[in-house]
Amino acid sequence: MYLQSSFRKSILTLLAGVSLASVVVFAVVPHSIHAQNRMAFSAVSSSSGHVALGLALRKLSVSGTFLQAPAHPDDETNALFTLFGYGMGLRVIDVQNNRGDGGQNEIGPELFRDIAVLRTSELESAHRIDGAEQYFTRAIDYGYSFDPEEVIGKWGRKDIVGDYVRLWRTLRPDVIVTMNIQGRGGDRAHEATTVLVRESFRAAGNPAMYPEQIGEGLRPWQPKKLYFAGGAPGGGGGGRGGGQTGAEAAKLTPVNTGAYDELLGRTYADIGNDAHSNHKCQGVGGLGGGFGGGRGGGGGPAGAAAGRGAPAGADGPPGAARGGGFPGGGRGYTLVDTTISGQLQKEEASLLDGVDTSLTGIAQYAGPNPPRALTIGLAAILTDARTAQKAFAEGSDSGTAAPVEAGLAAVRALRAQLGGLALSEPARYEVDFRLRLKERDYQDAVLAAHDVTFDALADDGLVVAGQPVQLLLTATNHGASDVAVTGVEIAGFEEPGNCALGPAGKGAAYTCNAQAHVPKDAKPTTPYFSDNYWKHPENQAIQIFEPGVPFGVPFAPTPFRVTFHLKAGSAEVTRELPIENRYVKDLYFGDKRMELNVVPAFSVRLAPTLAVIPAASVGGAAKAVEREVHVTVTNGMKSAAKANVTLEAPAGWKVTPASVQIALTHEDESLSARFQVTAPLQPKLGDYTLRAVVTSPETGDRKFTDGYLEIEYPHVQRRQVIEPAEIALKVVDVKTVPNVNVGYIVGVGDQVPPAIEQLGAKLTYIDQDELAWGDLSKHDVIVTGVRAYERRPDLRAYNRRLLDYVERGGTVIVQYNKMEFNREDYGPYPAKVSGNRVSDETVPVKVLVPGDPVFNFPNKIGPNAWTGWVQERGLYFLGDKDPKYIDLVSMVDSFKDNPGEKLGSMVEARYGKGKWIYLGLGLWRQLPAGTDGAYRLLANLIALPKAPAQAAPARKTNGELHR
């Protein structure tokens, strides 16, 4: 079902705001559910209106937590969050094993740490729509693996099981859904994740497991049910493999995410697909299979009408769709462990079968004979919830205010009574844990019933230590009765201004203009996991989390926050939200918001970040190698400033000039200083560091040696990563050929061109016009960037021109592409890209045509050229191909589940007078990492037109000689 564009937009906007009530970050603090530590992910400051009220009311009559535990960002099924969160009113949580650090980037240059930041931001954007909270373990996605035990070994079984146990004890989920342990396709980190989640399921409830957590104040918690994502018969969407058949398929618990929600005007699958489409750096568009089904959606529209207006079940909110077995409307899940007696033998209709998620069910935590005062109190709260829901169903939004106010008072009264009830201390904790959550839900419902929204804006988003900031704090009353602001607390600043208190009449707004100062000792903002990202324990792919940050949160909560205290009817409520800056980056991005980011007074960035110094060149006398280095300084201060820029070089290296003076006239202005850095005449092989230092009379004797990398796209909130202003100088045993002209067709997130320039080649970027009708013969070699055939429609359109260039004697090197390469025959002869890859970066590489120039000129490519590679050998090799293609190398992966000789990673074809080469070897990943052998191989590839003449390569395959 498709909605009109404007209505569709309005629903998404409402959902973005509504999710604020659900997207909460809980610190790991003993004896607290951390309900005040909120994190606003919304593009609007709060939710409002009829839809927001309806969703808030659904939460009041239920109590329970649904949690998914997938491996990587995009493995979650977002429609499950929308079904259980929006549809059923439960708390919904996404606990990712890792941040997807080892993946590819289909929209930009970020890799490793930086793509971890981007993918974390994309998850935040997804949860703005689906309403889930987000957490992570410390595991690092170190790359693709075919062996789950290898993955577990690198993560550290005890460590990551302990992380899951910590999160289960903190979040206390009732139902956990993870991936499918039976899957035999794809990255086996999925299977490893499932193994560890299963081990943690029982460990969390055992106080003898991870006793240090108990010592910190955490309490044992035993979740009630654990499910594996199951597939449709014969495969389907079972979390990347893992289809079940026969009797197993019959026992799958069905979930109908295709149900239609009248309040939202959409199906849960539709909303889930919109959320899932935020995984743009993975090329996700909202469709396709995945974790438990259609990744984002997980279900079609079949049986949708069954959910319209029907009660959700015992004590569930009316008007919501109940997840159940609607044929064709969802996916199935396999119950693998449960504490509910006999449940494994039952045929289930819902993931919640046997789990009491009613509000009155909170009494179960008081034991078999709960105090009568507790059951009476819970019943009274439920009565208020039902009264409010009934008023809403009858069309009286304003009629919901009095009962939700009464319900909030009843929750608070019951919490106050707990100390006097005949409850054990553990029982009191469990009951209060859930009542605190319910108090939060009732406060949200009070604000929704009175239709009050909040905003907290600063006049600057990039601030420096000590800077004054002007704040505009607003509480807007869209409702039918007056409210009053009784308190405003501004946090994170020095000398925050005071706000006069007062009413906000119906249709009016309370505003406060205040000035505050960023603390003089404020540190620059950076992801809490980024400072130590490269310092993880030796031989272990695990992060070091910064102390003091709530465990596993996406990013540390901003310290710059405001808390409003409000009197609405008879209720006193609070709302905390981050202070943001509203800005327009450009017309393409449109109006955006960001939390306040502290930046250095002078941000210092160097280019290039890696300077490769070849040890020798072919022909001519030896001479010292020079590199031009650009130091860009950005003024973070409000005032004009002068800066002195110097470079600290290794002993024996020369820097000219010794220093550069620059004058910055205004905030955010950037100026660059140029330096010539000259290596010694015969530098020793190895790694060196060049550091930039900026000083200024405006900042006394402070030295500025850091800059920040900005990570921002239209679909994510701006994030920055603080980096030292350094260049890695790498003297490499590589020979280069002078006067090589390379034409480059840029692909996705390309970092190969700087490496080509480091090798002394003249690089020219080929744009659409040149590709269409320019003189390509001026290039000795043309290189297409990573996934260029996906990114460049002009390349697909004018590919014939490249083949003509080859036919006349040119050399074309095509870096890896995915299946988009298979739409047409883009090579000189028929060939298809396959999913073949070699994930073990240490396996031997067998050279099949040792006499080919690519292995001999100007560098001899021997075994040492293949050492020191990172993450993998390569991926997306050529598969089925015409015999005219000659494989130059082969490999055998070390993983038993990736058997056989792998060809297609480096393939050459003679066409006319020239050469066409396909390169699945991962130079795009090795070159930025400074892998020596990758530079030698690249030097030979771009030097092919200059190599001595040689006959067509030949090798034997199956006893036949191929030329």
Model-predicted regions and their roles:
Residues 13-29:
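Bacterial N-terminal signal peptides
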Residues 36-170, 191-202, 206:
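Active-site rim/loop-helix segments in enzyme catalytic domains that contact anionic ligands
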Residues 203-446:
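The feature marks non-catalytic terminal segments
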Residues 441-453, 593-603:
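Proline/serine/threonine-rich low-complexity linkers at boundaries of modular beta-sandwich domains
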Residues 458-738:
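Long beta-sheet-rich domains in secretory-pathway and surface-associated proteins
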Residues 703-785, 816-820, 925, 943-963:
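Aromatic-Pro/Gly-enriched surface loop or interdomain linker
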Residues 787-870:
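A glycine-rich, often tryptophan-bearing local segment used as a flexible ligand/cofactor-contacting loop or short
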Residues 832-930, 949-962:
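Catalytic beta-strand/loop cores that center a nucleophilic Ser/Cys/Thr
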